[in-house]
Amino acid sequence: MSDMYHQLPPEIWVKIMDHLKEVSLLLTNKDFFGLFNLIDVEKNMIEHIVENGYLDVLKYIDSLKNQNKFIVDKEKFSVKSLDKYLIMSCEFGHLEMTKYFVSQGANVKTDNNMPLRLASQNGHIDTIKYLIENSVDVRANNDCALRMASLFGHINVVKYLVDMGADVTSDNNFAIIHTARSGRLELAKYLAEKGADIRASNDSAVIRASERDI
């Protein structure tokens, strides 16, 4: 990629970037990164980096900041909130980035345990295990993690959370009711085996299942 950079003068690359409206190329190596001095990028690059899991790039930017380099002393490289970026890394399942933010001081329980909720909702089992191993309460917010994992059909996550102490009957058997509504027979059977009440809320789960011919 560095060889490609040197095939064209910087001003041509700037025009290409302006035309493509794609900033990821600027993150491929130090040569392209230097074009940030010449290109007006409106988006916050830290958010873009976190969404895509570019941990090495994030560490490189942090090293430049520690050296007080002008190129990263701009709004597009500003860190709005470590906790916010931790939440994002958990949402997208970037485990190593999650660990990095925690090492920098981010709170794994931030925003009412939002990291665990979003990791469970999106089925990122390794991130979930890391959070729980680092003192996040598996039963936080009335077993929100279990309810979200059930709602979105992540059976491996549900099983892990139950093994760690989550209650399948929380919120008036929310998990099995919504699992039945979604037609996820295997997960519904598992929840019932673990004590969820199939007849809760006036047989809501049974009705939902019958509507789908389960």
Curated annotation (Swiss-Prot):
<feature type="repeat" description="ANK 1">
    <location>
        <begin position="41"/>
        <end position="70"/>
    </location>
</feature>
<dbReference type="Pfam" id="PF12796">
    <property type="entry name" value="Ank_2"/>
</dbReference>
<protein>
    <recommendedName>
        <fullName>Putative ankyrin repeat protein R844</fullName>
    </recommendedName>
</protein>
<feature type="repeat" description="ANK 4">
    <location>
        <begin position="142"/>
        <end position="170"/>
    </location>
</feature>
<dbReference type="InterPro" id="IPR002110">
    <property type="entry name" value="Ankyrin_rpt"/>
</dbReference>
<keyword id="KW-0040">ANK repeat</keyword>
<feature type="repeat" description="ANK 2">
    <location>
        <begin position="81"/>
        <end position="110"/>
    </location>
</feature>
<keyword id="KW-0677">Repeat</keyword>
<dbReference type="InterPro" id="IPR036770">
    <property type="entry name" value="Ankyrin_rpt-contain_sf"/>
</dbReference>
<feature type="repeat" description="ANK 5">
    <location>
        <begin position="172"/>
        <end position="200"/>
    </location>
</feature>
<feature type="repeat" description="ANK 3">
    <location>
        <begin position="111"/>
        <end position="140"/>
    </location>
</feature>
